[in-house]
């Protein structure tokens, strides 16, 4: 029997009724999230057996908005691990990991890139060798956000060197709190330290902590990366109108801790919001060339927002992440570069003065923009990789010739 899909209004009414009986401002954040998870309203688009309601993807935003309008905390840390394990993991993993992930009891990080395997992620060389009931892991990962306080990691390692490179990779869940895992912060040229490098020396993973199948982890990795591109824009937690109490205070503290890592992300995106007023304040808006470049920037920014809307609309219909993610990321990179160009035109040589200098424009924000924008074209997959994804998967263009294609990775890595 086909069940009729509820309307947004009926979903909102049901959420309001539930929150009325369940929300208590005196609850701790963990206790409140336990209630959310148990009710299915934490991630309503997930299946009912896995803490959801079996609703369409658009219901997630509808429910979060209604929970907040009722004065309750609506944020739940599903991250990238949640949808990946839900889609690709076995049932015992869903039972073991999804609930503590949603309640915030366990923090996750992503351990994919390596010093010599960033854009060519399938060229990774971190190894995992089965030893009885455990995998023994050795190697190095890099550009790992949140690794310094994570409990678990989404982790890729090579488990077979005698097959083509994409075929010998396995996707694991790595316990981070063990002697064989060393995490070191990476200091960036904009003086932030948002990422880490992780050194693995005989670290151990339970034999069955494999997402998908052994040697077939590339499929699961693609699912994670698709979600990363699709949800690449950081959404700030919203707390307006929420009843004061322990849950709100803890949610604010949690959001503030997460935000430390991303404090420079607005600068990485180019700070388009500052351009017009800055041009007016300096008189640069009287220059027709500057005005032309500002108009170009604002047009690009508007087009980029439409691409983001397309991605959201695709998700609302339940369609898996498609080329909109890569197209949107490219658009954001182009906007950021154009914004940096315009900021430099407006501020001139003063654009390079840091915040400590009294002559620095906007307290050094422009200088931080100029040295942060290059990251927009690298993080989460370089512009070149996005072009390849669009050409290959969306346009059906032939791939670049690869003389090592089909060779065992033990041989192919020498090309």
Model-predicted segments: where are they?
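Amphipathic, small/basic residue-rich leader segments at the start of a protein or domain
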Residues: 1-78, 86, 96-100, 246, ...
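Glycine-rich phosphate/cofactor-binding loops in nucleotide/flavin-utilizing enzymes
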Residues: 11, 58, 62-63, 80, ...
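C-terminal helix-coil-helix/basic helical segment that borders enzyme active sites and/or dimer interfaces
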Residues: 24-27, 280, 284, 288-291, ...
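Internal helix-loop-helix
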Residues: 38-105, 146-152, 301, 308, ...
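A structural signal for short hydrophobic beta-strand segments in well-ordered beta-sheet cores
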Residues: 126-129
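A short core secondary-structure module
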Residues: 133-134, 138-186, 196, 222
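Glycine-rich beta->alpha junctions and the first turn(s) of the following alpha-helix
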Residues: 181-302, 376, 412-415
């Amino acid at each position: 029997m086909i069940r009729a899909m509820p309307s947004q209004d009926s979903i909102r009414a049901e959420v309001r009724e539930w929150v009325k009986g369940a929300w208590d401002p005196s609850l701790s954040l963990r206790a409140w999230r336990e209630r959310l998870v148990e009710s299915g309203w934490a991630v309503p688009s997930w299946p009912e057996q896995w803490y959801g309601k079996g609703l369409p993807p658009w219901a997630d935003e509808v429910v979060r908005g209604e929970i907040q309008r009722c004065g309750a905390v609506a944020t739940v840390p599903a991250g990238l691990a949640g949808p990946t394990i839900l889609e690709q993991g076995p049932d015992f993993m869903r039972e073991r990991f999804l609930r503590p992930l949603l309640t915030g009891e366990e923090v996750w990080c992503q351990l994919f890139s390596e010093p010599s395997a960033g854009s060519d992620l399938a060229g990774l060389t971190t190894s995992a060798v089965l030893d009885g009931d455990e995998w023994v892991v050795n190697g190095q990962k890099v550009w790992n956000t949140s690794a310094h306080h994570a409990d678990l990691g989404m982790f890729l390692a090579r488990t077979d060197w005698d097959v083509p490179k994409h075929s010998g990779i396995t996707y694991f869940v790595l316990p981070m709190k063990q002697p064989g895992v060393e995490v070191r912060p990476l200091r960036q040229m904009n003086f932030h330290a948002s990422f880490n490098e992780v050194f693995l020396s005989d670290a151990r993973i339970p034999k069955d902590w494999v997402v998908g199948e052994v040697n077939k982890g590339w499929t699961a990795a693609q699912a994670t990366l698709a979600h990363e591109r699709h949800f690449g824009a950081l959404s700030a937690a919203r707390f307006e109108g929420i009843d004061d109490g322990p849950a709100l205070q803890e949610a604010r503290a949690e959001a503030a801790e997460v935000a430390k890592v991303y404090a420079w992300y607005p600068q990485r995106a180019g700070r388009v919001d500052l351009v017009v007023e800055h041009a007016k304040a300096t008189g640069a808006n009287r220059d027709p060339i500057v005005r032309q470049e500002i108009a170009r920037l604002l047009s690009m920014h508007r087009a980029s927002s439409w691409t983001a809307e397309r991605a959201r609309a695709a998700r609302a219909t339940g369609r898996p992440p498609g080329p909109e993610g890569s197209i949107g990321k490219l658009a954001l990179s182009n906007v950021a570069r154009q914004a940096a160009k315009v900021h430099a035109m407006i501020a001139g040589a003063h654009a390079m003065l840091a915040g400590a200098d009294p002559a620095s424009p906007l307290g050094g924000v422009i200088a931080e923009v100029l040295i942060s924008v290059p990251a927009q074209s690298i993080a989460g997959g370089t512009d070149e990789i996005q072009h390849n994804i669009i050409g290959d998967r969306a346009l059906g263009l032939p791939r670049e010739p690869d003389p090592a294609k089909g060779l065992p990775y033990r041989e192919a890595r020498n090309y």
